[in-house]
Regions:
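Generic signal for short, ordered secondary-structure residues
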Residues: 56, 137-138, 182
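Short, structured secondary-structure boundary patches
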Residues: 44-50, 141-144, 189-192
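NAD(P)-dependent aldehyde/semialdehyde dehydrogenase
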Residues: 1-92, 102
Length: 197
């Protein structure tokens, strides 16, 4: 793990999930190995447990821990999905022959609005740095759901501070916003038109 604090936070998170009724199927404890380590952990909860305490059973466990929520049917799964907080990713595994297309069509709309990146038949471990990639999501997955940690050029936007200057005199504006382009090369949108003037 990244640090002692992250390792301690993961251990506390797993403990919270256990106290909320999740059953540890594997791991569950900090590792005795040197460094900031935790045993690979898998916990299980029923959909009924999750729906009864969604906030607690969504306690963040940043690291090598997963909670499997077991649903009896699609209706129960939809209730679980509707109680999800924002997440970076959501994965749906389906039959490539299409035998479960009707179920997929019910699940995806409920999941889509709760994740920044929807995957089908794929684990979310690989994140390509490309214009089409998003590694953000609705709060609390990210602090600002409009931006992503990867992806070109939008990843840089998360470091930007948005500001509006309204009725500010020309002499008080930053150079890039003055009527005269400071370099003659800077692209600017003026009255809805992109120009280098």
């Amino acid at each position: 793990l990244l640090s002692k604090g992250v390792a301690e936070s993961l251990a506390r998170g797993v403990e919270v999930l256990e106290q909320a009724g999740a059953k540890v199927l594997a791991g569950g404890k900090p590792s005795t190995a040197a460094g900031f380590r935790h045993t690979n952990t898998l916990l299980r909860a029923t959909a009924k447990q999750f729906i009864a305490a969604p906030h607690v059973l969504q306690t963040e466990c940043f690291g090598n821990a997963s909670l499997a929520v077991v649903c009896e049917d699609v209706a129960e799964l939809l209730c679980v999905l509707k109680s999800l907080e924002g997440n970076l990713t959501g994965c749906v595994y389906s039959d490539t022959a299409g035998s479960d297309d009707a179920t997929y069509d019910k699940i995806v709309p409920a999941l889509r609005e709760r994740v920044g990146r929807l995957l089908n038949d794929k684990m979310p471990t690989g994140v390509a740095v490309s214009a089409a990639m998003n590694h953000g999501g609705p709060f609390p997955a990210t602090g600002h759901p409009g931006f992503t940690a990867v992806g070109i050029p939008t990843a840089i936007d998360r470091f930007a501070m948005w500001a509006c200057y309204d009725n500010v005199r020309e002499t008080r504006l930053p150079d890039a916003l003055k009527n005269k382009n400071p370099t003659g090369k800077l692209w600017r949108s003026i009255d809805g038109e992109w120009t280098q003037k």
